[in-house]
UniProtKB/Swiss-Prot annotation:
The keyword Calcium applies. Cu(2+) binds at H20, H108, Y195. This is AA9 family lytic polysaccharide monooxygenase cel61B. Belongs to the polysaccharide monooxygenase AA9 family. Residues 1-19 form the signal peptide. The lineage of its organism: Eukaryota, Fungi, Dikarya, Ascomycota, Pezizomycotina. GO terms for molecular function: cellulase activity; metal ion binding; monooxygenase activity. Induction: By cellulose, lactose and sophorose. Keywords: Calcium, Carbohydrate metabolism, Cellulose degradation, Disulfide bond, Glycoprotein, Metal-binding, Monooxygenase, Oxidoreductase, Polysaccharide degradation, Secreted, Signal. Transmembrane segments: none annotated. Binds 1 copper ion per subunit.
Length: 249
């Protein structure tokens, strides 16, 4: 058991050195909710279990990314070998979700940030990720005047990003898919880096709108999309944020 603990520590260290980040936690109107963190993977390996959290299980052991050549694989849904979170957080429609990335400072100032949502027909804790159809509710790209990307804004905000749950969204069980697309290598084929992170949230309130038909995660992006393969190191006057159209609610 002692050797397992040592291996776990080494694994966590390797992740912090080689990797980039994941959603460590998220708050809703100030209420803290734990995300799935790398420590939990090693807890599962050593003990067979880990804490019940709303963040989805994923095996991004290097805190790394999904590359464009993996866009048609299940890993693009909610990261590598992802599985639903064991519980759901609760939030009223119209609430703000603040996603906290970590464990260190996000290293990439180039690239957009997007967030999707899907309603589960039952509990999101047992949903089949391959059957989910995603609707985009938030997107941010580049400020053409300042040439500052959304990910630089995230860094300036202490690795935090705020997403508003549409006020009109009807009550139900939802999975929110929050994603950074790091574009520092986007000028080369297969150079974009996607960091999808998923959390379960039970939405309450008086909203009445159902989500429109969504898009399977494996169809959200193509490696040659103009917002995926482009030169981020030139003055940008037009940029198409990857993914389907934004739902206005």
């Amino acid at each position: 058991m002692k050797s397992c603990a040592i291996l776990a520590a080494l694994g966590c260290l390797a992740g912090s050195v080689l990797g980039h980040g994941q959603v460590q936690n998220f708050t809703i109107n100030g209420q803290y909710n734990q995300g799935f963190i790398l420590d939990y993977y090693y807890q599962k390996q050593n003990t067979g279990h880990f804490p019940n959290v709303a963040g989805w299980y994923a095996e991004d052991l290097d805190l790394g990314f999904i590359s464009p050549d993996q866009y048609t694989t299940p890993d693009i849904v909610c990261h590598k070998n992802a599985a639903p979170g064991a519980i759901s957080a609760t939030a009223a429609a119209g609430s703000n979700i603040v996603f906290q990335w970590g464990p260190g400072v996000w290293p990439h100032p180039y690239g957009p940030i997007v967030t999707y949502v899907v309603e589960c027909s039952g509990s999101c804790t047992t949903v089949n990720k391959n059957n989910l159809r995603w609707v985009k509710i938030q997107e941010a790209g580049i400020n053409y005047n300042t040439q500052v990307w959304a990910q630089q804004d995230l860094i300036n905000q202490g690795n935090k990003w705020t997403v508003k749950i549409p006020s009109s969204l009807r009550p139900g069980n939802y999975v929110f898919r929050h994603e950074l697309l790091a574009a520092h290598g986007a000028s080369s084929a297969n150079g974009m880096q996607n960091y999808p992170q998923c959390v379960n949230i039970a939405v309450t309130g008086s909203g009445t709108k159902a989500l429109p038909a969504g898009t399977p995660a494996t169809q959200l992006y193509k490696p040659t999309d103009p917002g995926i393969l482009f030169n981020p190191y030139t003055t940008i006057t037009s940029y198409t944020i990857p993914g389907p159209a934004l739902w206005q609610g």
